[in-house]
Amino acid sequence: DAYRVIEGNTRAYIYEELSEKYVNDKKWKTIDAYILPHRIDRNQINFIRLEKHLFGQTPWSAYEKARELYRLNVNEDYSFKRLEMLTKLRASEIQNNIQAYMDMEEQYLPKYNKPTERVKFSYFVEFRKNKELKKLVNKGLVTLSEFCDWVGEGKFKRGEDIRKLSLVLNDEQAKQELINDSFQAALEQLEQINPAAKSKLFEKIEDVTKGIT
């Protein structure tokens, strides 16, 4: 009888490769596996995958989790409300992750396609969830294509940098520093008129002030 692997494909592939390489080594000839009931349906399979990799001992990377959310939403027609119930994530988180995944797949990775580029997924999540950046995008003051190039060119050191990107884009001189040099250079330019741009203390003071007003 033949069995279909519904989870653990990478592990099964590795065992198959090693079995061909080490023909006389019996430990690569078999692999421990759970055999599921023959009549198990798609929803049960999807739940097993989520339980294993979103909450289990072998979690997927943030990028892989987003890809699964995208698959369930687009290919399996799972609503955001249903995904909320299954994942315990907020609908806004799910939507931002799916959109960030689409941004990378459709615009970023075709141009910057090294395997290591996927670790920059958090940059795109931050881009999508930032309300000030959304306003700038809607006004046509920044495009996803521009953002992709800035990420691909190494303008940012970490995903957290994106949280301050709107400050830079709202200042013409700082924006030019970003384009010509780096995000760090843009912050140094911006710091001359806005101390909160680089200072965590001033940043917290500014946040408190916004909360009061």
Label the predicted regions.
Residues 1, 23-29, 86, 113-213:
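Accessory, typically intrinsically disordered or conformationally flexible segments
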Residues 25-106:
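Amphipathic, charge-rich alpha-helical segments that serve as recognition/docking helices
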